[in-house]
Structure formats: C-alpha cells, structure tokens
C-alpha cells in the first residue's frame, strides 16, 4: 500500500535533480555510492537516502551493497536507459514553483533553491492597466551572485507591475549552465503559447548519449531556431 501511494506522488526536488543529473551525464558510470552522490550534490546523506527510496518506489533505480572491500558502501544503480528513464519519469516531475511580487518598477531578483548556490530564474512582468495585469516582458536571466539585483516590493494597490518568478533547480554538478530538461519542464508549465516552439526544440536538441547526437527519432519535432538550441 505504501509503495502504491509513493508511485502516485510527484518526485521530490532532490529525486528529480538526480534523474536530470543522470540524463545530463553528471555521473561517471552507472554505479555511484550514496556518499559520493551526497558529496556531489552537497547534501546530507539522509536526504539522498530518501530520494533513493522514492526512485526505488517508482522503479527508476535501486540500491545495492558493495562487494569485497566496498561491502560497507551502498550504491545507486539505475534500472533504465536514458530515454526510457525520461519517458517513465516525466509524468512524476514537477515544474518550478512560481512566486508573484507587486512592484513599482520591473527589476531582476535572485531566487535560490535550498542547498543550491546557482539559480536560473525566468521573469515575466505584467503591466497593470485598469487594475489588471497585462504581459509586457518575458525572459530568462542567470546569475551566480546572491544580491546582484533586488526588487522593490509594494502593496498590491500601489503596484504598477506584477513580476512573476520561476524558481529552477540549481545548476547541476559539473555544469556551468542550466540544463535543457529543466527548461523543458519550466516551459511546459508556463501555459504560454509563445513558448511552445522552444518547448519542442528542447527535446529535439538534447544530447541523450553524451556524444553530441540529437534526440531519438520518436522525440523529434520540426527543427526550430530559438534560445534553447545548441
């Protein structure tokens, strides 16, 4: 019964990051100890253990004990190839959370995830006209500085703009920019028809095997130009 309940739940952020890290070739080989993963993500081992329990409940990975001199170690083994893992896991993945701020003037603001030093945030600014917000700006920003830019928040009655922030997972270990699969989840959640072309392009251009090849044929869409292309 407990397993059944867990399989209906959305993935926790850490479990989701582990899957996306696996798909983005952040792990060397298929066999990493729980401690190595905890060190890689700079989180406590208990957090990795809970994420592993959820991955096991969904049938995405399983834990095994090492042999010989490594008997004291517990390893995480992945049960699916990259394409199969993505196809199976996407229905349990969550889009980034959204926050709204009422402001006098539009400005950038940093939002950091728990345990993440780096964050990519999407900002949508709505101009208030006749008391109702209207879309006037949409874009992506990336920064490594926590207080690079702040926003002046005011009461809704005093605001001229409503700024919408999308909070993404931290940049993956060994990477220096946001990964395309997290962008895919974020654009899917926006409900913005202008993003649909970029949304299709993300899967088309994702490097599934680590050698620069594009997405498998069953994921292919019409090639499009956009900010997410490689």
Regions flagged by a language model, labelled:
Residues 1, 87-230:
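Long, low-complexity, charge-rich intrinsically disordered regions
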Residues 1-21:
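Short alpha-helical segments that sit at the start of domains
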Residues 9-15, 30, 50, 54, ...:
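Short glycine/proline-centered loop/turn elements that form peptide/ligand docking sites
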Residues 23-29, 173-174:
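Short helix-capping/hinge SLiMs at alpha-helix to coil transitions
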Residues 27-41:
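Short acidic, hydrophobic short linear motifs in intrinsically disordered regions
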Residues 42-57:
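Short amphipathic alpha-helical interaction segments
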Residues 56-67:
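A short, conserved structural fragment
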Residues 67-77:
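Minor-groove-contacting beta-hairpin "wing" of winged helix-turn-helix DNA-binding domains
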């Amino acid at each position: 019964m407990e397993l059944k309940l867990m399989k209906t739940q959305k993935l926790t952020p850490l479990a989701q990051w582990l899957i996306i890290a696996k798909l983005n070739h952040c792990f060397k080989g298929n066999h990493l100890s729980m401690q190595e993963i905890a060190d890689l993500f700079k989180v406590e081992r208990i957090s990795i253990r809970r994420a592993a329990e959820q991955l096991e409940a969904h049938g995405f990975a399983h834990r095994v004990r090492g042999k010989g001199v490594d008997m004291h170690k517990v390893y995480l083994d992945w049960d699916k190839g990259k394409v199969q893992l993505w196809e199976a896991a996407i229905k349990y993945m969550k889009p980034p959370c959204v926050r709204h701020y009422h402001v006098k003037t539009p400005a950038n603001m940093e939002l950091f995830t728990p345990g993440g030093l780096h964050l990519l945030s999407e900002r949508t600014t709505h101009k208030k006209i006749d008391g109702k917000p209207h879309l006037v700006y949409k874009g992506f920003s990336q920064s490594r500085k926590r207080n690079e830019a702040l926003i002046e928040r005011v009461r809704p009655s005093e605001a001229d703009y409503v700024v919408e922030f999308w909070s993404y997972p931290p940049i993956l270990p060994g990477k220096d920019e946001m990964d395309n699969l997290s962008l895919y989840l974020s654009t899917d959640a926006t409900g913005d028809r202008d993003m649909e072309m970029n949304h299709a392009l993300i899967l088309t251009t994702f490097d599934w095997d680590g050698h620069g090849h594009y997405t498998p044929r069953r994921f292919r869409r019409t090639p499009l130009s956009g900010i997410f292309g490689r």
